[in-house]
Amino acid sequence: MKIIGVGCGPGMLTEQAIKELRRARMVFGSERAIGLARAYLPEGCQIKSIDDYKNLSRLHSDAVILSTGDPMLAGLGYLSGEVIPGISSLQLASARLHIPLSRVSVVVAHGRGHEKGMAETVDEVKRGKIVFLLADPKFNVMELYARLATLTPPIQVALCENLGYPEEKILVKTIQSPPEPSTALYSLFIGNF
């Protein structure tokens, strides 16, 4: 089995990923991931949309599983098999904002991990790190902002929406007047940058 990162948007596939996609016979992925990879899939390749992620480990050894962004950044890299990295939203946002990756701490706040994600974000900002936060649409970003507002300034927040897509938007504000997400596909940089 191969787990291939298809990047966080159009044009973000690596040469290695393209090479592997061109040889694929059976591909599984979300609709978004399939859309990013479709142009490189050979004729006759079986393409299946994933709805149930619980049974992925049981797929045939020839299967290719597509992961948006990079499989090792809140992706499908936990599965057994060869991982082909992709260009992540973290890499793209860091490049756009000129934030060195060595200063970044990644916090994932998906599903039931909202409270833990908020606590980790506050702790990492206190330590002087710049947090890259990946959250799901149900994450209460306004509650996080209220917690961060009690810390000593300066704290900036960069809202990164639809990274890598034509409608990409990055908005940088202070914690006193933070940006509010307007789409489900967003991430945040938080800290002194």
Can you name each region flagged by the protein language model?
Residues 9, 70, 88, 111-113, ...:
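Short acidic/polar capping segments at secondary-structure boundaries
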Residues 2-3, 15-16, 46, 62-63, ...:
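A contiguous loop/helix-start segment that scaffolds small-molecule binding in enzyme catalytic cores
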Residues 6-12, 45-58, 110-122, 171-179:
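A short, well-structured beta->alpha microelement
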Residues 33-39, 114, 139-142, 167-168:
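Short, charged/polar "capping" segments at the starts of alpha-helices
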Residues 40, 76-77, 94-95, 117-120, ...:
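Short, well-ordered secondary-structure micro-motifs
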Residues 1-99, 185-186:
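Class I S-adenosyl-L-methionine
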